[in-house]
C-alpha cells in the first residue's frame, strides 16, 4: 500500500537522545490525528528486545520484532515514530523524516540532567557532532522527505511543531 492509499501520513522524528524527539512527537500527536509511537516504550511493553544492556542502560532491540509489530500500523498510516534511528523503516511507508539537531554543549547538559553515564553522554555527543542520525536519514530516504530542524530553544521547538502541523495539513489536502 503506497502513501496515496493512506488517509494519514507516517512521520519519523529522529535524532540523538536529548534532542527533543519525544517532546515534539507528543506535541504533534496532540495537534494532529496522528498516533505517537515511542519505540523505546513499545520495545519495553511488548518485549521486542533480546535483553537489557547493563553497560549502556538500554534494551538490545530486536529490530525484526519491531518491524513486525509496526508494519500493520504503518500500512494504515497516521503514525509518528519517535526513535533515535530511522534506517530500519521502509521508504514506501514513510512520508516525512524529521531529524532534530542540538548544539553539543546543550545536548551534554540535557543528557547529564537525565543521569546518563559520562561514557553514554560522550558517545551520544559524538554522534550528534558527527551527524550520525542526519546521515542515516539522508542515506535511507529520498532527500526530499528529510528535514533537519534545530531543537535548542522553546522558540525553535514551537516553530518545529508549527511546521510539522502545517505539513500534515498540506499532506492531507494532497492525498
Curated annotation (Swiss-Prot):
**Catalytic reaction(s) noted:** AMP + ATP = 2 ADP; ATP + H2O = ADP + phosphate + H(+)
EC main group: transferase
Give me any GO biological process, just one: ribosomal small subunit assembly
Q: A GO molecular-function term, please?
A: protein carrier chaperone
Coarse class of the protein's main subcellular location: cytoplasm
Task: Specify where the region named LID lies, as residue ranges.
Answer: 113-123
Residues binding ATP: 18, 20-23, 114
Does Cytoplasm show up as a keyword for this record?
yes
GO cellular component terms, A-Z? cytoplasm; cytosol; nucleus
> Is Cytoplasm given among the entry's keywords?
yes
Family membership noted in the UniProt record: Belongs to the adenylate kinase family. AK6 subfamily.
Function of the molecule: Broad-specificity nucleoside monophosphate (NMP) kinase that catalyzes the reversible transfer of the terminal phosphate group between nucleoside triphosphates and monophosphates. Also has ATPase activity. Involved in the late cytoplasmic maturation steps of the 40S ribosomal particles, specifically 18S rRNA maturation. While NMP activity is not required for ribosome maturation, ATPase activity is. Associates transiently with small ribosomal subunit protein uS11. ATP hydrolysis breaks the interaction with uS11.
Any idea what this protein is called? Adenylate kinase isoenzyme 6 homolog
Q: Which organism is it from?
A: Schizosaccharomyces pombe (strain 972 / ATCC 24843) (Fission yeast)
Amino acid at each position: 500500500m503506497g502513501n496515496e492509499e493512506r488517509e494519514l501520513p507516517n512521520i519519523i522524528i529522529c535524532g540523538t537522545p536529548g534532542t527533543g524527539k519525544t517532546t515534539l512527537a507528543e506535541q504533534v500527536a496532540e495537534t494532529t490525528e496522528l498516533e505517537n509511537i515511542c519505540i523505546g516504550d513499545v520495545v519495553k511493553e511488548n518485549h521486542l528486545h533480546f535483553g537489557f544492556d547493563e553497560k549502556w542502560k538500554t534494551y538490545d532491540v530486536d529490530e525484526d520484532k519491531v518491524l513486525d509489530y509496526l508494519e500493520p500500523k504503518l500500512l494504515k498510516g497516521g503514525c509518528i515514530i519517535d526513535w533515535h534511528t530511522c534506517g530500519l523503516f521502509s521508504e514506501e511507508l514513510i512520508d516525512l523524516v524529521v531529524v532534530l539537531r542540538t548544539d553539543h554543549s546543550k545536548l551534554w547538559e540535557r543528557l547529564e540532567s537525565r543521569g546518563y553515564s559520562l561514557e553514554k553522554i560522550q558517545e551520544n555527543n559524538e554522534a550528534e557532532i558527527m551527524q550520525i542520525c542526519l546521515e542515516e536519514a539522508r542515506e535511507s530516504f529520498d532527500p526530499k522527505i528529510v528535514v533537519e530542524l534545530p531543537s535548542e530553544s522553546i522558540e525553535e521547538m514551537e516553530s518545529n511543531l508549527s511546521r510539522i502541523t502545517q505539513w500534515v495539513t498540506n499532506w492531507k489536502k494532497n492525498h
